Amino acid sequence: MTVQTSKNPQVDIAEDNAFFPSEYSLSQYTSPVSDLDGVDYPKPYRGKHKILVIAADERYLPTDNGKLFSTGNHPIETLLPLYHLHAAGFEFEVATISGLMTKFEYWAMPQKDEKVMPFFEQHKSLFRNPKKLADVVASLNADSEYAAIFVPGGHGALIGLPESQDVAAALQWAIKNDRFVISLCHGPAAFLALRHGDNPLNGYSICAFPDAADKQTPEIGYMPGHLTWYFGEELKKMGMNIINDDITGRVHKDRKLLTGDSPFAANALGKLAAQEMLAAYAG
């Protein structure tokens, strides 16, 4: 007999009127083991350049009916790209807007993954004790050791990052100083921080989570309501081109901007980023 899982969002008792994804949506879109593979970098980077991760520091995203979606950074979208980059020789630092700890969507953590979970445990302190982004931005110059900025996905990227002047300054520095920018799924919402000033990403093409898919997820209880705005629409208004309208695990390179469409693209994006950065810094 087939057991039917509920499509009702699950209550998050830590906050009033807040909800996790439904049992059904978790059964469809999460797994206890990731699809990590292809981690093969026989000549890793040995220098000082590293990755700056701009992580989410807020958990609750309001929806159109007043209910809160309990979110953060998606673990797969965060950890798989970093696993590849770390294996390729690039260390990383974590920063949040507030300097407070990174929020993760723990309901998507691959708890039985024998490679990803030890990697997370090894680096958990970086996420628990991040730098304050404003302090990082204040120290940026042409000689800074950051080779890339990485903005992980998860709906937590919709909270605060799109309005942050510090995010804008970090992205402007990266593009103008020929550094890589890496992101996937909802992470490119951070690019909206550039829309009210100098926008060096005007004309760039990316992969990202489609607005059309976000409009469907409440039907299966992934979110407890609809979003109040859609980041893809806003990115297009600021001159960016989203090349995908579906979710296939697609990745894309436009100059030094590397992007992926969803958690299904996390492993491929990690490979792409590691290969591109090795070619640039370890060649």
UniProtKB/Swiss-Prot annotation:
One GO cellular component, as annotated: cytoplasm
Its recorded reaction(s) are: N(omega)-(1-hydroxy-2-oxopropyl)-L-arginyl-[protein] + H2O = lactate + L-arginyl-[protein] + H(+); N(6)-(1-hydroxy-2-oxopropyl)-L-lysyl-[protein] + H2O = lactate + L-lysyl-[protein] + H(+); S-(1-hydroxy-2-oxopropyl)-L-cysteinyl-[protein] + H2O = lactate + L-cysteinyl-[protein] + H(+); N(omega)-(1-hydroxy-2-oxoethyl)-L-arginyl-[protein] + H2O = L-arginyl-[protein] + glycolate + H(+)
GO MF annotation list:
glyoxalase III activity; protein deglycase activity; thiolester hydrolase activity; zinc ion binding
**Where are the active-site residues found?**
C185
Instruction: Write out the entry's keywords from A to Z.
Output: Cytoplasm, DNA damage, DNA repair, Hydrolase, Metal-binding, Stress response, Zinc
How is this protein induced? By heat shock.
Which residues are listed for Zn(2+) binding in this entry?
Answer: H86, E91, H123
What is one Gene Ontology biological process annotated in the Swiss-Prot or TrEMBL record?
A: DNA repair
Superkingdom in the source lineage? Bacteria
Per its database record, what is this protein's job?
Protein and nucleotide deglycase that catalyzes the deglycation of the Maillard adducts formed between amino groups of proteins or nucleotides and reactive carbonyl groups of glyoxals. Thus, functions as a protein deglycase that repairs methylglyoxal- and glyoxal-glycated proteins, and releases repaired proteins and lactate or glycolate, respectively. Deglycates cysteine, arginine and lysine residues in proteins, and thus reactivates these proteins by reversing glycation by glyoxals.
Name used for this protein in its record: Protein/nucleic acid deglycase HchA
Q: Which organism is it from?
A: Escherichia coli O157:H7
